[in-house]
């Protein structure tokens, strides 16, 4: 009805308790309203609205409404920066093998250290695919990474990006699926489930942080009535079927992917240098103020013709917690980590405290000599089960009693490893009472939207310290973080899994990469009872090649 008719009807309906609020809301809106919106404002149900329609007061019509999870989000538009010489070399190779005329699909392993600018290569590849009227699929290992990834991609390609992940409602996922099928979006971002988005013109698949175990769906996640798959294997097959380029990127490639590259099944693209982040208008005062990370100037150039600034990866201090114990320090924080944390917060900077644990699995270690209880038959670390009060071998299922003394040195100082984030948070408040702490683990992100909320709180500097598990090691760009503390590096090292050394190296390297991503520099403190382990030593040196060679030898020796 017209505004005049609505006003007249509103006056006539003044005596009706049922009609008046609805007419008032419609009159105030001065436009058609969705039933759900009107119901939220007035409590109107469909029966009441149909009665009003029968009385000639309102009109009703059905209209398809697609729910877009990014609707209402505003992303700052960005333009492509000039590439560094290293990025240019990688991009020239990628373009020649994947996007030039006459080229079919190709598969690449992009091995670049944390902060080397891999995302810009992804963006260039997407731009090339779009120029060929093709579409792109971008896989990330966790929903937690989606907000930052979407912001980068939507800023470069406004209106062409959408997301698919399990935090969307069933209706939202259905609507996004239909919109993608209709060709409304050219770029889909999401975790492994996004692989099944109906992209009819797929030309590029990107797997960011390809080493992450979350790309493989495990039986314990969904029960026995689910198809289990490895997203990397599915993506490889999908790329072959659709003749799409496949880019698998990581600072710490999986052993399988790096071995496949050596066998000639993937083309290697390397970016061994970290580009100083947030550099578009980097003040020279900030470059000179870099604290613990030395800053080098290269002859490469940015848009504004300023020299490219490279930053070395943050130095890593390994703290032997056995020595801390002998010195009388029985807390979960070493003296070095406590001092660094206090200095960081005093300088107005941020810190990440990382716990390398998976679920509630724990093991038993001697705090004097560092010996770990192992199965005498399998040489596999035994897992402590609190309810059963037993040590269980997850390889042969044999059970053993809990030792009262260390079988190696006779010490009675036996510790059960597996401290949680809550305990770490409590200790932070003991040494820095005024610290604002956020926790990022499976418990703290149980509700929809919690990933983005926690990340936003930390990025906006409404928190000083982030305490978390594996989630915080995955590709986040946090420029104010200058300190990363690994509370117990050994926890993941002695899980009953042949990949435990690989995953420990990957996690330590990745979480160390969260520090020093701006001109402020950074430092990393790794606490461990086994500082001599090759995975910890290689991670401290940011040396993937050394770790790969040693781990490959270990696997060959053990079949």
Segments (PLM) and residue ranges:
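Pre-Walker A segment
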Residues: 1-140, 443
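Inter-lobe coupling/hinge segments of SF2-like helicase ATPases
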Residues: 78-84, 88, 92, 103-559
């Amino acid at each position: 009805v017209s505004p005049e008719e609505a006003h007249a009807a509103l006056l006539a309906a003044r005596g009706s308790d049922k009609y008046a609020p609805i007419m008032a809301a419609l009159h105030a809106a001065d436009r058609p309203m969705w039933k759900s919106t009107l119901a939220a404002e007035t409590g109107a149900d469909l029966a009441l609205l149909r009665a009003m329609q029968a009385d000639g007061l309102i009109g009703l019509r059905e209209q398809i409404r697609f729910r877009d999870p990014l609707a209402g989000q505003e992303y700052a538009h960005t333009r492509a920066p000039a590439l560094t010489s290293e990025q240019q070399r990688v991009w020239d190779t990628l373009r020649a093998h994947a996007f030039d005329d006459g080229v079919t699909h190709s598969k690449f392993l992009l091995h670049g250290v944390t902060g080397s600018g891999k995302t810009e290569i992804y963006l260039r590849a997407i731009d090339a695919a779009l120029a060929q009227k093709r579409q792109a699929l971008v896989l990330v290992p966790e929903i937690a990474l989606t907000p930052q990834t979407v912001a980068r991609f939507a800023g470069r390609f406004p209106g062409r990006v959408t997301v698919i992940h399990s935090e969307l409602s069933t209706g939202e996922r259905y609507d996004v699926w239909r919109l993608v099928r209709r060709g409304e979006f050219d770029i889909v971002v999401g975790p492994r489930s996004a692989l099944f988005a109906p992209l009819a013109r797929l030309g590029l698949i990107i797997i960011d942080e390809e080493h992450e175990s979350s790309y493989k769906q495990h039986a314990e996640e969904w029960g026995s009535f689910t198809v289990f798959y490895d997203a990397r294997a599915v993506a490889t097959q999908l790329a072959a079927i659709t003749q799409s380029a496949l880019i698998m990127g990581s600072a710490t490639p999986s052993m399988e992917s790096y071995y496949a590259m050596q066998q000639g099944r993937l083309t290697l693209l390397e970016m061994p240098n970290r580009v100083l982040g947030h550099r578009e208008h980097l003040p020279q005062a900030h470059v000179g103020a870099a604290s613990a990370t030395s800053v080098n100037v290269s002859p490469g150039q940015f848009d504004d013709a300023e020299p490219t600034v490279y930053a070395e990866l943050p130095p890593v201090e390994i703290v032997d917690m056995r020595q801390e114990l002998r010195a009388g320090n029985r807390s979960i924080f070493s003296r070095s980590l406590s001092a660094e944390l206090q200095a960081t917060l005093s300088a107005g900077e941020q810190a990440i405290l990382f716990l390398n644990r998976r679920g509630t699995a724990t093991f038993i270690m001697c705090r004097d000599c560092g010996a770990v209880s192992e199965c005498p038959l399998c040489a596999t670390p035994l897992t402590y089960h609190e309810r059963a009060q037993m040590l269980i071998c997850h390889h042969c299922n044999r059970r053993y009693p809990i030792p009262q003394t260390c079988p190696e040195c006779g010490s009675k100082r036996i510790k059960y490893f597996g401290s949680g984030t809550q305990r770490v948070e409590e200790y932070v408040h003991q040494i820095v009472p005024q610290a604002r702490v956020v926790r990022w683990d499976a418990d703290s992100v149980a509700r929809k939207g919690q990933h983005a909320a926690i990340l936003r709180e930390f990025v906006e500097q409404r928190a000083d310290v982030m305490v978390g598990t594996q989630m915080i090691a995955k590709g986040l760009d946090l420029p104010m973080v200058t300190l990363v503390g690994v509370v117990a590096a050994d926890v993941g090292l002695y899980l009953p899994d042949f990949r435990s050394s690989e995953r420990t190296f990957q996690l330590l390297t990745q979480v160390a990469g969260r520090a020093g991503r701006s001109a402020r520099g950074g430092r990393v403190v790794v606490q461990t009872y086994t500082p001599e382990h090759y995975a910890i030593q290689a991670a401290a040196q940011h040396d993937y090649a050394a770790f790969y060679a040693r781990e490959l030898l270990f696997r060959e020796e053990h079949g």
